[in-house]
């Protein structure tokens, strides 16, 4: 399941509540073509048995501008990876293989 984050308070709470689970954040925009391509893949990964202990968050950079500003997002899609509230990795682009590899590396 993907949790849609509306603001910075919700983002901070989601990171805190995740504890030591891997958190994957998809920074996206409705007008971004590559974002629309990778979005359904992100959704499918979130429902996978392999990733039951991974928290999937989605941040629309227009709806939650405070979060995208706080995280210094420059392009979409950008994926951030967190553990214990700390960012441990990131990459930009709609690359399914890279997304899966990084989730598997960090989970």
Swiss-Prot record:
Molecular functions per Gene Ontology: protein-disulfide reductase activity
What CDD domains does the database record attribute to this sequence?
A: TRX_family
Q: Which Pfam families match?
A: Thioredoxin (PF00085)
Organism of derivation = Ictalurus punctatus (Channel catfish)
- Give the matching Gene3D superfamilies: Glutaredoxin
What's this protein's function? Participates in various redox reactions through the reversible oxidation of its active center dithiol to a disulfide and catalyzes dithiol-disulfide exchange reactions. Plays a role in the reversible S-nitrosylation of cysteine residues in target proteins, and thereby contributes to the response to intracellular nitric oxide. Nitrosylates the active site Cys of CASP3 in response to nitric oxide (NO), and thereby inhibits caspase-3 activity.
Q: Which family does it belong to?
A: Belongs to the thioredoxin family.
Q: Which gene encodes it?
A: txn
Q: Which UniProt keywords apply?
A: Activator, Cytoplasm, Disulfide bond, Electron transport, Nucleus, Redox-active center, S-nitrosylation, Secreted, Transcription, Transcription regulation, Transport
Q: What is this protein called?
A: Thioredoxin
């Amino acid at each position: 399941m993907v949790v849609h984050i509306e603001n910075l308070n919700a983002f901070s709470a989601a990171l805190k509540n995740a504890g030591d689970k891997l958190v994957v954040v998809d920074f996206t925009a409705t007008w971004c073509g590559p974002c629309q391509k990778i979005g359904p893949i992100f959704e499918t990964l979130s429902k996978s048995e392999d990733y039951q202990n991974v928290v999937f968050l989605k941040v629309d950079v227009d709806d939650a501008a405070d979060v995208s500003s706080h995280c210094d997002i420059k392009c979409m899609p950008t994926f951030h990876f967190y553990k214990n509230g700390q960012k441990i990795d990131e990459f930009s682009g709609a690359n399914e293989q890279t997304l899966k590899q990084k989730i598997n590396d960090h989970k």
